[in-house]
Amino acid sequence: IGSGLVGSEMCIRDRYRNLAVEEYLLLHCEDKECILYLWQNQNTVVIGRNQNAWKECRTTKLEEEGGHLARRLSGGGAVYHDLGNMNFTFLINKEEYDLDRQLQVIIGAMEILGLKAEKSGRNDILIDGKKFSGNAFYEQEKHCYHHGTIMVGVNMETLSRYLTVSKDKLKAKGVDSVKSRVTNL
C-alpha cells in the first residue's frame, strides 16, 4: 500500500478549511493509497453529521465567546477543538480499510511515549479509564476515512462550558460530567 503524509509549512487552523481538505482528500485518494492528515482547529465545536447543534452545544455561549461551530461528514458526538487537541484522519480505499490497524497506530504512538492506551467500544481510546481520543468514521462509494482527536492540553473548563451531554449518556458511562470522563495526555 502506498502512503502519504499531507501537511503544510504553515499550520492551518481554520475549521472549515480543515474539514474541506479532509473531504477533498477523501474524494481524491488513490486506490492503493493511505493518507494520514494531521490538523488542528482553534476554539471550535465540531458536531456529527446528524446531530442537533442546540442539543449538543451551548451555541449562544460559544458564539458570544468568539467560538465557531462546524459540522463534519461523519457521525458521532460533539467534540471541542482548541490548540491543545491534535486531530488525525486516515483516508483509504474500502478494500484496504482496517480500523484495528489504524487504531493501533495511535495506541502504538502512546506506547512509545510510555503511556498504556486501550481501545474501548467502537470509537474511544482510553488512558487510565478516561477518554483522550474519540473517533468517528465516514465512507462513500470507493473510499472511507477514520478520524479522531488526541487530547494533549485541551482547556477542560472551556470544553465543559460549551458541550452539553445528556444525563442518560453520562450515567451510562458512570461519570458525573464530561470533564470527569475525558483526560489530556
Please tell me what each predicted stretch does.
Residues 1-7, 12:
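Single conserved hydrophobic/aromatic residue that forms the stacking wall/gate
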Residues 19-20, 24-32, 36-56:
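N-terminal low-complexity or amphipathic/hydrophobic leaders
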Residues 54-77:
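Active-site cofactor/substrate anionic-group-binding motifs, chiefly glycine-
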Residues 55-57, 96-101, 158:
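Short, conserved charged micro-motifs
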Residues 73-91, 168-185:
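Residues forming anionic-ligand binding surfaces in small-molecule and nucleic-acid pockets
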Residues 85-122:
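Contiguous, small/hydrophobic- and glycine-enriched helical/loop subdomains that border
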Residues 113-114, 133, 141-185:
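Long, positively charged amphipathic alpha-helical accessory segments at protein N-termini or as interdomain linkers
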Residues 119-136:
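Beta-rich nucleic-acid/ligand-interaction surfaces
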